[in-house]
Amino acid sequence: MTERAVPTIPGFTAGYVDVAGLPTWHEVHGQGPAVVLLHGGFSGAAAWSAQAPALAGAGFRVHVPERRGHAHTPDVAGPLSYDVMAGDTIAYLEAVLGDRPAHLAGWSDGAVVALLVAQRRPDLAARLVLIGQYYHSAGRAAGRDLDQWLRSAAARDFLRQGYDPFSPDGPGHFPVVYDKTLAMIESEPELDLATFGTVTAPTLVLQGDRDVVTLEHSAAVAAALPDARLAVLPGSHALPLELPGVVNPLLISFLRGAVATPASAPGFLSNG
């Protein structure tokens, strides 16, 4: 099984933890208040490779779990849904942190999962960061064009490169995960923002101005949550990968309890 190189960080570990019977791969970096980073679809811990060391270096204990059917974590029979992934994440938090709250940061599908976790279990979410999130399919800028691309042979071959070297289920299982993930993306999430009034965690909604999510959609999320602000970074769409030099100080500042300002993360637009 191919492993990716990671920086040498005091307190770094990687391996499997039992989560309600599912062997779940995770990385743990550093020491301090807990931050849990939730990756997007067809991805894994590597998506946060520019953030985990920076957050650990800033004094956080960073947990990066990989969800069922992603990277090192095996698949589970049955359909995939955001509801299922939120349940898995709650079980992970309980298994690893007990009843202690953690800061949750999610990107793309991971942001949807983080939002659902904070809705269901506000006691587990200290602060919340939603990057490139979408609570409804209408908010995706690319819409059905993205769905069609994901069904293309080129997309399938590209996504397979991030699955085959890592999955304990073997490369032959990729078509199963591919089909169930696309079935989920094409029909979910269709969430009602009016139901998220229970999200009590201070929230940062973050996106690029060229993101797959419309600005209006993210503004609606920030307006609907009880304690949220929106930050838009110019000239980018895959923020954690493209702009870590801006994203990382912004995350650190927010997770430490400060309201993000242009001084703490230059080059972004914010609604305060």
PLM segments and residue spans:
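Alpha/beta-hydrolase fold catalytic core
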Residues: M1-V35, G57-F60, R256-G272
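Active-site loop/oxyanion-hole signature of alpha/beta-hydrolase fold enzymes
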Residues: I9, S49-A52, G57, H63-A105
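Conserved HGGG/HGGXW glycine-rich cap/lid loop of the alpha/beta-hydrolase fold
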Residues: D18, L22-P74
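Flexible "cap/lid" loop of the alpha/beta hydrolase fold
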Residues: V112-R120, L124-F158
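Active-site nucleophile elbow and catalytic-triad environment of alpha/beta-hydrolase enzymes
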Residues: D179-T195
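Short beta-strand/loop motif that positions the catalytic acidic residue
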Residues: T198-V199, V205-Q207
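Conserved alpha/beta-hydrolase "acid-adjacent" motif
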Residues: V212-H217
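Catalytic active-site module of serine/aspartate enzymes centered on a nucleophile-bearing elbow/loop
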Residues: A228-R229, L233-G272
